[in-house]
């Protein structure tokens, strides 16, 4: 007999607060029946003007995509249920790439990095072949299961593409991973926005810190151009026609081999393709997977042999998240919006 919503919610023990966005809060939890670790994404139901039949459109889109997409490197939806003013989506998870990158006790070998990027591109190629943009790729949206398999997650901003005249919002992708065309306000774009984000994630894996971490769109563009050089109409046709375009000083940029001194020629070729300013000629997922970088030694590390987060690092992250959770509760009390009991 199928369990009712309240009984399904009680199957999971909440362990840790992982993060919060504009539309959702994510928790780490344990399935009491199987003892497996899951991620629970609680999507807030919006106002009537933002909802359809009481369900937030973002939630509907994410549930629909997770049900339609089936690939080893895309997160699977275990369950979805509504309770009070939230919709909960459940997915398997052990950790995410951000935890791995920040754990300085771990050594990321060239083979490890190749494995992470290979799995990211395989999942992305599948999405793009099915005419779906992710639009929010970043390390903590790349989950890793207990077998070391990387899975693209968080499809709250994912969108179908393909219509040549379709207009989208440019306020997508976390700023540090946002492509220049988005920073210049482009309303029509394609797979290039995801590919730039992959380049930024690859750079972060190599450097162990975010490659370009601007605190505003203008600051982000300045950092990009200082590092990679300022594009021109010759290198990026149509750039000056973008809605929020502003002219920049002509920075010469720094050769990528000086920024990523340990990278070989094949890896530098991939980075250059991902960091191409003209989105029309930026390397696609399918093109990237055919590059020599993935066919030469070392081969990608098998999933079970990839590094696992240090328990002390996980504990530190849990402590940080606990402090964030306390601040959220304090803010809620001050605003008079704290619920008596937090439920799934």
Swiss-Prot record:
Transmembrane segments: none annotated. One of its GO terms (cellular component) is transcription factor TFIIK complex. Residues 12-294 form the Protein kinase domain. It comes from the Eukaryota. This is Cyclin-dependent kinase 7. It is found in: Nucleus. One of its GO terms (biological process) is meiotic cell cycle. SUPFAM superfamilies: Protein kinase-like (PK-like). Probably associates with cyclin-H (ccnh) and mat1 to form a multimeric active enzyme. The modification Phosphothreonine is found at residue 169. Keywords: ATP-binding, Cell cycle, Cell division, Kinase, Meiosis, Nucleotide-binding, Nucleus, Phosphoprotein, Serine/threonine-protein kinase, Transferase. The active site is at 136 (proton acceptor). PROSITE patterns: PROTEIN_KINASE_ATP, PROTEIN_KINASE_DOM, PROTEIN_KINASE_ST. Pfam families: Pkinase. The gene is cdk7. GO terms for molecular function: ATP binding; cyclin-dependent protein serine/threonine kinase activity; protein serine kinase activity; RNA polymerase II CTD heptapeptide repeat S5 kinase activity. The keyword Zinc-finger does not apply. ATP binds at residues 18-26, 41. Its EC number is 2.7.11.22, 2.7.11.23. InterPro entries: CDK, CDK7, Kinase-like_dom_sf, Prot_kinase_dom, Protein_kinase_ATP_BS, Ser/Thr_kinase_AS. Phosphorylation of Ser-163 during mitosis inactivates the enzyme. Phosphorylation of Thr-169 is required for activity. Phosphorylated at Ser-163 and Thr-169 by CDK2. Phosphorylation at Thr-169 is required for enzymatic activity. It comes from Carassius auratus.
